[in-house]
Structures are given as C-alpha cells and as structure tokens.
C-alpha cells in the first residue's frame, strides 16, 4: 500500500515528517530517480534517495515503536554535531536504533528528554496542536509575589508571541532562591526562562521532570537512559491518535 513519502521516511526513523517535507521542498528527495514533490506517494520497495544517498524505507517496517527516556545533564547539547566539541545527548543512546529526538532542551537545562524510533510519533508529540504538558522544576532568584504568579498564568507577550504557564506551584526553598513547578504546553525555545525573565526574575536552575504522563525516574542518573514500558508507549501513541 502506498503512503506519502514523508510518512514513510519518518516511519523508517530518518527524521520527523516535517523534516522530510522541508527536504522535499528543497528538492533533496527523489523517488525512482524523479524529484519528489509534496503529496507524492511511494511504497517501501521504491528507490528513494536523500541528497543522492539511497535509504531503506523498510528497515523498521516490522519493528515495534520504541521510546527511550534520557536524563540529560546540564552542559550537554541536543545536537549530533558541535564545532566546539561539546558532549551530545546522542553519545548516551543505544547504537542499535535510529533515534529521533522529541523536542530539545537548551544547553543549561537538565532532565527528561524523550527519543523514539517512530518519526511520526515524534512529530505528533512536538506539534503545538497536541497541547502536551511539559513540567519543569525551576529555581528562581528573587521574591515572587502572588501578582507575579497571576501574570505568569494569565499570559505575557514575548518577542515570538503570547505565552503562559498553565500551572505554577511552590516547590520549596529558603531565602532568595525558591523552587517552583511550572507547566507549559508548547516547546518554544527557552520559553520557561523567558517568561520568568520578562518579570525580571533570574532562573538559576531548570529541570524538566515530566512530559505528558511520563515522569523522570528518581533513580535515573545524569546521562543515563532507559526504555519506556510497552504500556507507556501505547499510552503515548494513543494520546496523539496513532
């Protein structure tokens, strides 16, 4: 059965569906020696190339969806390549699978990061329309009043549009530094930090502790990873109608 080429590429673990669509628009994908166009369909037996390199659309066709959780350490980058030679999260993943990262964390943020071999699942989980909770533990320097909490939950206009926390709860701490637990439903760059900074607060630590119903295991050490249980994977698939 034929399917849209971007879906086949995502299912084969080469990248998300959106990533494949960008390559199609750039003329970098061919099907049976013909330049692919958006909307083109293919089957896994077709000869498909990316930048002239033949890819295997069927390599994961019979493989079950896997999801991996990594406890990212601050200072580790979410990229495969780095001119400065810094450590990458991909150095800590099992090498037997083509992993697609679900969103990313900035350099100084630690905590829960998901990877999957199902590009379609990754794309759905990242898309803003899915409105999936992302919970963070954040240590804030400064005296936070109730009026600040109201502004953060009502919403603030940032340089890239309106943003807000869907929930803010006090997490403890003494003196000038206090911990809070906050929830956002988008994956915008540095969104949590920028919301606090908009009210002149400084974020001294930021840890992602939850994505959807998946929580960061307490015993999972920095830069260690573990597979989600099949029941958890099925719940993730169901949450985005896959």
Regions found by a protein language model. Give the residues of each.
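Basic, flexible Lys/Arg- and Gly-enriched helix-loop patches that mediate nucleic-acid binding at interfaces
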Residues: 1-242
């Amino acid at each position: 059965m034929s399917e849209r080429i971007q879906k086949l590429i995502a299912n084969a673990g080469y990248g998300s569906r959106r990533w494949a669509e960008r390559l199609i628009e750039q003329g970098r994908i061919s099907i049976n020696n013909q330049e692919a166009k958006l909307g083109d369909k293919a089957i896994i037996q077709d000869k498909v190339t990316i930048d002239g390199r033949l890819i295997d659309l069927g390599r994961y066709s019979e493989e079950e969806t896997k999801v991996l959780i990594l406890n990212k350490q601050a200072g580790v980058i979410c990229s495969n390549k780095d001119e400065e030679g810094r450590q990458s999260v991909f150095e800590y993943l099992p090498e037997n699978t083509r992993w697609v990262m679900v969103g990313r964390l900035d350099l100084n943020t630690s905590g829960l990061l998901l990877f999957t071999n199902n590009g379609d699942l990754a794309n759905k989980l990242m898309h803003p329309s899915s409105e999936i909770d992302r919970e963070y533990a954040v240590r804030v320097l400064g005296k936070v009043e109730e009026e600040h909490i109201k502004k953060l939950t009502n919403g603030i206009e940032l340089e890239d549009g309106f943003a807000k926390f869907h929930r803010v709860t006090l997490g403890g701490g003494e003196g000038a530094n206090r911990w809070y637990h906050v929830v956002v439903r988008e994956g915008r760059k540095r969104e949590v930090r920028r919301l606090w900074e908009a009210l002149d607060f400084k974020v001294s630590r930021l840890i992602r502790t939850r994505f959807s119903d998946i929580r960061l295991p307490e015993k999972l050490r920095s830069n260690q990873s573990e597979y989600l249980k099949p029941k958890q994977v099925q719940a993730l698939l169901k949450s985005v109608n896959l």
